[in-house]
Amino acid sequence: MAEQLRFDGQVVVVTGAGGGLGKAYCLFFGSRGASVVVNDLGASFKGEGNSTKAADVVVNEIKAAGGKAVANYDSVENGDKIIETAIKEFGRIDILINNAGILRDISFKNMKDEDWDLIFKVHVKGSYKTARAAWPYFRKQKFGRVINTASAAGLFGNFGQANYSAAKLGMVGFTETLAKEGLKYNIISNVIAPIAASRMTETVMPPDLLALMKPEWVVPLVAVLVHKNNTSETGSIFEVGGGHVAKLRWERSSGLLLKADESYTPGAIIKKWDQVTDFSNPQYPTGPNDFLALLEESLKLGPNDPGEKVDFKGRVALVTGGGAGIGRAYCLAFARAGASVVVNDLVNPDDVVNEIKKMGGKAVGAKFSAEDGDAVVKAAIDAFGRVDIVVNNAGILRDKAFHNMDDSLWDPVMNVHARGTYKVTKAAWPYFLKQKYGRVLNTTSTSGIYGNFGQANYSAAKCAILGFSRAIALEGAKYNIYVNTIAPNAGTAMTKTILPEELVQAFKPDYVAPLVLALCSDKVPKKPTGGLYEVGSGWCGQTRWQRSGGHGFPVDVPLTPEEVVKHWNDIVTFDSRADHPEKASDSIEKIMANMENRVGEGKSGAAENEHLAAIKKFTGVEGKGTEYTFTERDVCLYNLGIGAKRTDIKYIFEGNEDFEVVPTFGVIPPFNTEMPFSFDDIVPNFSPMMLLHGEQYLEVRKYPIPTSGRLVSKGKLLEVVDKGSAAIVKQGITTFNAETGEELFYNEMTVFLRGCGGFGGQKKPADRGASTAANKPPARSPDAVVEVQTTEEQAAIYRLSGDYNPLHVDPAFAKVGGFKVPILHGLCSFGIAGKAVYEKYGKFKNIKVRFAGTVNPGQTLVTEMWKEGNKVVFQTKVKETGKLAISGAAAELA
């Protein structure tokens, strides 16, 4: 048996420890020999009120079990007093767990300064104050352990949490810097993104999911990270909850390198955009790219193809910090491209304004601090009547080693960078919403992304800006407001203080501006919002998260730190199981996939053989028929459900001589067909919540399709593929006319079952011709494009054709699945796309799609079609996000 991890003789400080995760930390460390400082203000999850009771209850519980503990009731912004309690009571401080937090969730358009400031006071400044107070003791004793707390909302952004997302991602940059500064003193710092029930989350998680999100699933990971045995895992980011533990790291694309001269234009970048986002040969960095080497390579290249000119005529661009350096370069570039420019600078905007006017452009100055965002934006409105583009560039440096950092260095950096970015964007937001157009370009830095010595304040602020950007990108997408973030490498007034002059000259701001203009244009071809890009010296690349495959622990057995240690390599190794999460629901999905991982229900080798035997038994065996009766009313309802309008008489009026049903209706009759097998028979750990509809294939075996009648569908199992952590099940269903016996439709449905693999089944799916064809779109512009805007009621109408899954109508159920709102049925998107193909090219004998992403009712579906002989290859995108909803799709014409 593994030796128990103990904390005897050590002192642990836990903030926000009156309940939930904080309480679980305290009880654990108290039981493992540590002396515990239980800090809790006793406020509500919104940060209101205070009470000493919560901390006292936890202290008494620890003492009753024979442990040592003391309560502290200070707010975390008085972190020095919290650490003082540890020193006075126990004489030392070894481990600091910054867990205190509040929520002030509200849509960005309705957010008030108080909502922003309170979140930052508790999450960001509180973590800084406690860590700063503990740091001298850590350095002196050459031992310290820090855990800071981020969240999925911080890592990916989340609706209604612009403040919280910013604060939580700020913790990542802060932690990375502490890790770098502390390493030589054996001060280990890590950050976790926990999914755990607490006073905060009880208002936003359904009760059944809350029950599975016990804080006890988080504590063992933290125990391993703060134990004295951990001397190397530092500056790391972990996702944890519900038995799932994984590590995240930054992944940087190989990017696009162009010649850094006057031919380096926005159009040149856009023309080769695929290279910007090419992750085929990625880097896994802990700091900036080698820009000197890139600059040398860039200068060897020939002139760039300028591509399509980016035109900003009629647009108003506001640039903060626009009076010098990189901000000046932005202002001049926008002016040259036809924009009216608002030059914001606290010191001197006038020189740049005059420079623009001298070259025939339009510009006004706005001499305000970025913190006075209302005044900055008012200057744009007063001068030009509108604002279209905001580039948040203003910044200051107050660098100092963390042990010398104080509030006079921390607060100004946080105020100018994070709060200034929030204030200017917030002031512009109502205008963006009204005109249904806005472009925001925010500025992080490699210090924020990766941390940097002497820049704990700057790193936290810059990473917070990225979290803020990701959250408002989600909120703005439906209003055509795009938000992106760059980490520029250029010589500026700020960097002059830390770079030699010759390097400052080499890293011209002119080599950053083209990407800024590209991102603020309407020309970015894929995923035009929510991106993070590094740029400089003629190079630009995208940076994203990579997540390890991690390890899933059984949810019916208490998790211990010793068990975490046993599986540590699985948790931290980035192998073929690694993926690239993009949204908060990607965290929930991993945790939900682990919910059926139970020792008590585990399958032995014999049981696995039972699954294989069941697959063999049921494959190809046809089930008894399931009847489906439909009328012209059902035809009208289906057509309306996939987007038919009141003007489409032949789809909605049974009295029309051309009355018909769209051929994709063929997926409806077999929908509830009784199959001759159950999923429990053929795969382990089956749960309906783990089922994803992967692909759909439909053959229309007889035209014209009747508009009423009695049909019978018979189904059979075609194959089961074992993907290790999941299973793929393919079913075939034939639909007959009950009166004549004629075959009308044949469907193949492919479902993906998370957590149901590993039973020793076949590893690769069979080639089944048209139903499994890859259908890669040709490398040319589409031959036809059809846009259909869905309504917010689309799913509510479509479900009446037979798919009553509450995921598509019940907000509470959708939230359990990790979605902000009920999503559109995949087969509804299939119908909309199939209708586009049918109306453009006529009858098809078969149609196949792969479901590549979700669609929210109200979003616009864009179907792009390429005719290749008798085959129409197509794909369907969500216009508002640029993401694919349907891929690998084609229809063979009849």
Swiss-Prot record:
GO molecular function: (3R)-hydroxyacyl-CoA dehydrogenase (NAD+) activity; 17-beta-hydroxysteroid dehydrogenase (NAD+) activity; 3-hydroxyacyl-CoA dehydrogenase activity; enoyl-CoA hydratase activity; isomerase activity
Catalytic-site annotation from UniProt: 164 (proton acceptor), 168 (lowers pka of active site tyr), 458 (proton acceptor)
Keywords on record: Fatty acid metabolism, Isomerase, Lipid metabolism, Lyase, Multifunctional enzyme, NADP, Oxidoreductase, Peroxisome, Repeat
GO biological process: fatty acid beta-oxidation
Binding positions (NADP(+)): 14, 53, 99, 132, 164, 168, 197
Region (Disordered): 763-782
Domain MaoC-like: 776-887
Catalytically driven reaction(s): a (3R)-3-hydroxyacyl-CoA = a (2E)-enoyl-CoA + H2O; a (3R)-3-hydroxyacyl-CoA + NAD(+) = a 3-oxoacyl-CoA + NADH + H(+)
Pfam families: adh_short (PF00106), MaoC_dehydratas (PF01575), MFE-2_hydrat-2_N (PF22622)
Domain of life: Eukaryota
A GO cellular component entry from the record: peroxisome
Associated pathway: Lipid metabolism; fatty acid beta-oxidation
Region feature Short-chain dehydrogenase like 1, mapped onto this chain: 6-230
Region of interest (Short-chain dehydrogenase like 2), ranges: 311-523
Subcellular location: Peroxisome
Record: residues binding (3R)-3-hydroxydecanoyl-CoA: 693-694, 723, 803, 805, 826, 851, 853
EC number: 4.2.1.119, 1.1.1.n12
Assembly information from the UniProt record: Monomer.
Family: Belongs to the short-chain dehydrogenases/reductases (SDR) family.
Domain notes: Contains two SDR domains.
PANTHER family given in the database record: DEHYDROGENASES, SHORT CHAIN, SCP2 DOMAIN-CONTAINING PROTEIN
Name of the protein described by the UniProt record: Peroxisomal hydratase-dehydrogenase-epimerase
Organism: Neurospora crassa (strain ATCC 24698 / 74-OR23-1A / CBS 708.71 / DSM 1257 / FGSC 987)
Gene behind the chain: fox-2
